Amino acid sequence: RMLEAASMIVNRPTYYEISISNVDKPVLPQEELERRAARVTSKGNSIIVTNAPRFTEKSSVLPGAKFIIGFDTYIRLMDKHYYPDHVAGKHSPVENSLDLIYENGCGFVVAGRVDDQNQFRGLHDVEFEVPARFRNMFTELTEEQFRSDLSSTEIRNQTR
């Protein structure tokens, strides 16, 4: 449903992307990749499989893409913990990474999420400030446009 809601904003074809490698998880086993891909394609959707664990790599492989992400992923995108090897450049590792994503013509559509206190949180409900030069890279899916109280992991577990 998030992809459907975001497709109205980006006004172009949308695809699922799955990476066989992930910063926080082990390499995705072949059988799990096939299972997830089959679930997506059985509903008439297209999927792109990459070996790009971070959005810096994804933006290089898929220049011009608008990545549709959930709030939890947005928080991780802004976390310097995920960029230990991106120290070159004149800014913080996060800003250097956003620079590369921006240079590749990419952006993000971000869906909000309900927190532990049952409050819906979106782009404007975070404790950090996105540098002004990057703000136009982010578009928010409002609560009215899309709301799911389940994480992507919970959704995957329900469909097993």
Identify the residue ranges that each predicted region occupies.
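Nucleotidyltransferase catalytic core that binds NTPs
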Residues: 1-160
